[in-house]
Amino acid sequence: MDQGTVDSPVTLVIKAPNQKYDDQTINCFLNWTVEKLKKHISNVYPSKPLSKDQRLVYSGRLLQDHLQLRDVLRKQDEYHMVHLVCASRSPPSSPTSDSHFSTTDSSSSTSDSAGPSLSSTPSQEAQANSDGLRHRGNPAATHGLNPAPTGVMQRPEGMPLPMQGGPAAGFPTHPMYMPMQMFWWQQMYARHYYVQYQAAIAASRASSVAPSPSLSAGPATQPVQPNEPAAPMGPNPAPEDRPANPNIQMNAQGGAMLNDDELNRDWLDWMYTVSRAAILLSIVYFYSSFGRFVMVIGAMLLVYLHQAGWFPFRAELQNPRAEEGAQDEADQNQDMQEMERMMDEGIEDDEGDSGEEGPDDPMNPGPHQPGFLSATWSFISTFFTSLIPEGPPQAAN
């Protein structure tokens, strides 16, 4: 090959595989080596890559540094496409995920190979350091010992100590945690069921007897212990004799419900109430005598005052209800003791409402049967009450 052909310039089109830069056109000579071409590329290419970081690929072939371009390039081509690949010196875009997988792989391989000998520990540490991974506080990477089970704290003496409250979420379940976890869930279920049972009892008897504060404060102050028998609870003192308010509305938590719609009425509500009363009185006035009109007004006023709580008509039933309240209190205490014993022994109540007594129990008489006068008065008062709008409910005593 003559000297003119060797010194003739050729055109190379440098293409980047990541498409970060546009294709660059470089003029060189056939007598150049690949190493000289790399140095020229490091000067003219936009990213200024180092020569040792460059990899040139031509027609699917990796070009070595000692090769000359005349031995590689095809003579019939006018433009020669060369792909430039540069080794990245910057850290990867997602080092957290890579380190996580690398640490997981190294931990699993260390746990498998730590049994035969401890002589491979320096080589593993050197390999981990070369990969850019740092194991801080990991006994498997520093001392070559088996890692402690997940969710177990290591004592200074080397004895495993299980954490309180069971294993954390997402961790693998260890066989030693199964009894502890089942016991912990059983205690939580028992406490929740105990609180719900007391709330239901307080809501059921709130209309007749005020709930005892000692029973409602029991679960919050002293949790149920599995190995200690529950102390017997003495009968609570009988509540004071006071009339119960039958118009109390109860909410789901067992307390009196505050109805904002009844307490905060606007002028439209009052206008509607007055118009209903005026229509009723006008009908009675025009279609009856004056005496009947006065009687209806008096009856309406009496019923309204009764609903407002000024004239209670159930004073004769206060003492029987107080006695029934004391009897119900003793029965509820007995039911509480029975339920606590069943929860302490870990027995679930599958028989339904086992604490309720039947109507044939001689110690628990049936409810008070109203007389003829009470039934007649209830019928008449209910009839007139349905015609008169109700007033706002009174607060609990």
From Swiss-Prot:
Keyword Cytoplasm (UniProt): no
Chain segments annotated as transmembrane: 293-313
Membrane-topology descriptor: Single-pass membrane protein
Keyword Transmembrane: yes
PROSITE patterns the record matches: UBIQUITIN_2 (PS50053)
Matching PANTHER family: HOMOCYSTEINE-RESPONSIVE ENDOPLASMIC RETICULUM-RESIDENT UBIQUITIN-LIKE DOMAIN MEMBER 2 PROTEIN, HOMOCYSTEINE-RESPONSIVE ENDOPLASMIC RETICULUM-RESIDENT UNIQUITIN-LIKE DOMAIN HERPUD PROTEIN FAMILY MEMBER
Protein name per UniProt: Homocysteine-responsive endoplasmic reticulum-resident ubiquitin-like domain member 2 protein
Localization of this protein: Membrane
Organism per entry: Danio rerio
